[in-house]
């Protein structure tokens, strides 16, 4: 599986940071 750091989510094999 494609994994991202904590607080990030994966989409299309890229990581995006969750902005609050």
Curated annotation (Swiss-Prot):
Compartments it resides in: Secreted
GO molecular function term, any single one: toxin activity
Keywords: Disulfide bond, Hemostasis impairing toxin, Platelet aggregation activating toxin, Secreted, Toxin
Keyword Hydrolase: no
Limits of the C-type lectin domain: 11-20
Gene Ontology CC annotations of this record: extracellular region
Tissue and organ distribution: Expressed by the venom gland.
S-S bonds: 4-15
Function: Binds to the platelet and collagen receptor glycoprotein VI (GP6) and activates platelet aggregation.
Family, similarity comment: Belongs to the snaclec family.
Note: Negative results: does not agglutinate fixed platelets.
Subunit structure comment from the entry: Heterodimer of subunits alpha and beta; disulfide-linked.
Identification of the protein by name: Snaclec ophioluxin subunit alpha
Organism of origin: Ophiophagus hannah (King cobra)
């Amino acid at each position: 599986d494609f994994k991202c750091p904590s607080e990030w989510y994966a989409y299309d094999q890229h990581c995006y940071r969750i902005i609050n």
